[in-house]
């Protein structure tokens, strides 16, 4: 309890609590700061570094803790690191039980899976697919954007990272977003010139992506 309170007091937006999760502990913490880790191996929750089988289902965990947390990190343990795809149906079962934030992990290995999870309002935690370059982050990010709504362009609001002041409104196509993510410098699409342009190339006033 003291460690959790200290981490939150030091500015953590969220903390993840796994084996230690209990009604007593969670009731003493601000629930908007808490994600409960549910580690599932073949349909049963495992704790203590995945070494202890509890015999409890993930569904029971959600019913038990749903009023005490902000959301869940749900890991399919038997799929973790295998690069064979995750268990989408098991994850969707959890989605049906809660409206809270849900992050899925374990075996996610393709952009199609990421898109399917996103469609169901489920975030993806990626590991091995990034390390092995099976999925590139910039490709995954772009896949979540709907470029077709406005003739392959999306409005891009540019904001100062420190002051939060809105600096400009520009438009980006997929190539502009990809270049921005790869180079770290803001690149947009000029509708008047019908071409990409990187802010600051001539003036030197670059916009760095943070």
Predicted feature descriptions by range:
Residues 57, 83-86, 109:
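Short secondary-structure boundary/capping elements
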Residues 1-14, 26, 89-124:
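Catalytic cores of alpha/beta
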Residues 23-36, 114-143:
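C-terminal helical cap(s) of enzyme catalytic domains, especially alpha/beta-barrels
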Residues 30, 66, 96, 118, ...:
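Anion (oxyanion) recognition and catalysis
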Residues 142-210:
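Binding-site signature for planar aromatic cofactors or substrates
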Residues 2-80:
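Conserved anion-binding
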Residues 15-19, 75, 80-83, 103-107, ...:
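Glycine- and other small-residue-rich loops at beta-strand/loop junctions that grip anionic moieties
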């Amino acid at each position: 309890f003291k460690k959790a309170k200290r981490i939150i007091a030091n500015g953590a937006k969220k903390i993840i609590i796994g084996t230690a999760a209990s009604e007593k502990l969670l009731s003493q913490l601000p629930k908007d700061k808490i994600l409960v880790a549910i580690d599932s191996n073949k349909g049963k929750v495992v704790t203590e570094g995945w070494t202890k089988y509890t015999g409890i289902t993930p569904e029971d965990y959600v019913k038990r803790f749903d009023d005490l947390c902000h959301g869940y990190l749900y890991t399919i343990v038997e799929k973790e690191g295998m690069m064979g795809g995750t268990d989408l149906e098991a994850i969707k079962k959890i989605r049906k039980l809660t409206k809270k934030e849900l992050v899925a992990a374990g075996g996610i290995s393709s952009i199609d899976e990421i898109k399917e999870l996103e469609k169901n309002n489920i975030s993806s935690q990626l590991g091995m697919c990034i390390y092995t370059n099976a999925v590139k982050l910039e490709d995954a990010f772009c896949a979540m954007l709907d470029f077709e709504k406005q003739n392959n362009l999306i409005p891009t609001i540019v904001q100062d990272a420190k002051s939060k002041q809105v600096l400009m409104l520009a438009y980006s196509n997929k190539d502009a977003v990809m270049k921005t993510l790869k180079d770290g410098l803001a690149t947009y699409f000029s509708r008047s010139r019908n071409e990409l342009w990187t802010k600051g190339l001539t003036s030197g006033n670059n916009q760095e992506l943070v």
